[in-house]
Amino acid sequence: MSKIIGIDLGTTNSCVAIMDGDKVKVIENAEGDRTTPSIIAYTDDNETLVGQSAKRQAVTNPHNTLYAIKRLIGRRFEDDVVQKDIKMVPYKIAKADNGDAWVEVKGQKMAPPQVSAEVLKKMKKTAEDYLGEKVTEAVITVPAYFNDSQRQATKDAGKIAGLEVKRIINEPTAAALAYGLDKKSGDRTVAVYDLGGGTFDLSIIEIADVDGEHQFEVLATNGDTFLGGEDFDLKVIEYLADQFKKDSGIDLRGDSLAMQRLKEAAEKAKIELSSSQQTDVNLPYITADASGPKHMNVKLTRAKLESLVEDLVQRSLEPCKVALQDAGMKAGEIDEVILVGGQTRMPLVQEKVKEFFGKEPRKDVNPDEAVAMGAAIQGAVLSGDVKDVLLLDVTPLTLGIETMGGVATPLIEKNTTIPTKKSQIFSTADDNQTAVTIHVVQGERKQAAQNKSLGRFDLADIPPAPRGVPQIEVTFDIDANGILNVSAKDKATGKEQSIVIKASSGLNDDEIEKMVRDAEANAEEDRKFEELVQARNQGDAMVHAVRKTLSEAGDKVSDSEKESIEAAIKDLEEALEGSDKEAIEAKTQKLTEVSSELAQKMYADQADQAQQAGGQEEGQAKSADDAVDAEFEEVKDDDKK
């Protein structure tokens, strides 16, 4: 049986590893390097270059050289971060027919998974050359904070590259696997700080020995899918362009060739300043004007670089706080801090992490290779070559459905261990409702509209019944890759509908981190909204109950009584249209008072009838007491296709 390889598909660099006996081996590519730049170029003679060869010709071919494609994977063209990316890169980002963000090269549109597949193909070939046999299966890593669409798109890239993706695993978890496998002693809690080329993750992971088995349990994860080395480079590029404009009066930002040279120089300067205090950026013939050629010569000190990127490093500490809070831990309770991702080589990053956790981060983990090594270990676990490892990962955001009054009712809370399956019974909002729309949302806000809509589907042909009677079982099922399936079943008829959340409806990165931040900042607003919805639901239920009692009472109620009840109903219905909680509560109370006499009369009549019937109906009232009222849109037959 061929080996399952482990691939770290990175924003800036990628890496491939395998389990060789009981040791993990990172495989060198054809150029002799252990990592490969995630850069793809399309040349004039229709050749596709991947890795170092693509990087070398980027300066002369900026429009057809694609890098940081991982930032576009599984995203919509209209996403804020994609719009931000358009201004940052020399290649063209185009809108696909389905609204996704694609790239355009030589007049041809290409999907990000298609481009990423070229990098995966090179990783596959690297492994095949080393093993001397065909490779068809892989474990591929993704940032822990990747959403459903991004995970799906990564799987698609693997498929395009001719790989069966056996598992998608989170990068920090993979790094913890690589770190923890050869450390035999005792239980410990580690924080994996993963600052890569394009994304940032922080995971808190408990490593324990359970009956001779290494158990890796993720307690909490948080992150920012648009924060990484590319952003650090951009700060340096901006600074160099500003300095040049100040010195020569020429703005290089419109010159893609010059900007590509600046990008290369900025990355090189940033790397040099991790080991030296000062570097020179020398770029002869960067541009020219009427007076002749212009050269760039800028001195850049480590202190200057640190002042340029300090806000980015600071931004990475926010998810650290949230993850600790979610895990119910203090920074001092973390036993080890592991740094992953090339950007963690920067002294300022190491210093801030040390300051935050109060301990020196470990230096015995290779930040560029640990993730691929962890993926290879997971591959060996799946193929049965490694038997004493159990990996328990989590879903990063709360998943639920929209219920009555626009509330997001959670089914699976964030940081729930996956795979997981959860069901809950919901019901109809109106009498004789024959169809419901299940609206799936993802995020931390109480109001469904404030969260991200992942998809909708209809469950039709529900037998007509009073509201609250039908029992609709909604089931959320997250697989080990973190990919979601949702189904709804009418328990009376057994009729079922389901949906796999498709890549075209994913979240964008800003929204994800914003959701968690907003949830904290808007806790008060959410509380008021919940109270308003509660008042509305009580008012609604009161109107429904009184109307029903009125129609059952028939001529037992006098005209004057009927008039005052109808007037109170009208007042309450008007109040329900607005957003004044106090007014709704007052009108509900008024309706309760004017209808109480009628209710007592009806109750007395029923008591008499019940006595005569000998109480035979006892116990039949237990219908769907456990059902949660849910406001589903009724699906009209003529809307159906």
From Swiss-Prot:
Residues found modified as Phosphothreonine: T199
GO terms, molecular function: ATP binding; ATP-dependent protein folding chaperone; unfolded protein binding
Which UniProt keyword terms apply here? Answer: ATP-binding, Chaperone, Nucleotide-binding, Phosphoprotein, Stress response
An example Pfam family from this entry, by short name, is HSP70
Q: Would the keyword Signal be found if you checked this record's keyword annotation?
A: no
Residue spans of biased composition, Acidic residues class: 626-641
The highest taxon in the source lineage is Bacteria
What the entry lists under Gene3D superfamilies is as follows: 1.20.1270.10, 3.30.420.40, Actin, Chain A, domain 4 (3.90.640.10), Substrate Binding Domain Of DNAk, Chain A, domain 1 (2.60.34.10)
- Which intervals carry biased composition (Low complexity)? 604-615
Describe how expression is induced or repressed: By stress conditions e.g. heat shock.
Q: Where is this region: Disordered?
A: 602-641
Q: Which family does it belong to?
A: Belongs to the heat shock protein 70 family.
Describe the function of this protein: Acts as a chaperone.
HAMAP family according to UniProt: DnaK (MF_00332)
Known PANTHER family for this protein? Answer: HEAT SHOCK PROTEIN 70KDA
Q: What is this protein called?
A: Chaperone protein DnaK
- Please report the organism this UniProt entry assigns to the protein: Marinobacter nauticus (strain ATCC 700491 / DSM 11845 / VT8)
Species lineage: Bacteria, Pseudomonadati, Pseudomonadota, Gammaproteobacteria, Pseudomonadales
**Gene name per UniProt:** dnaK
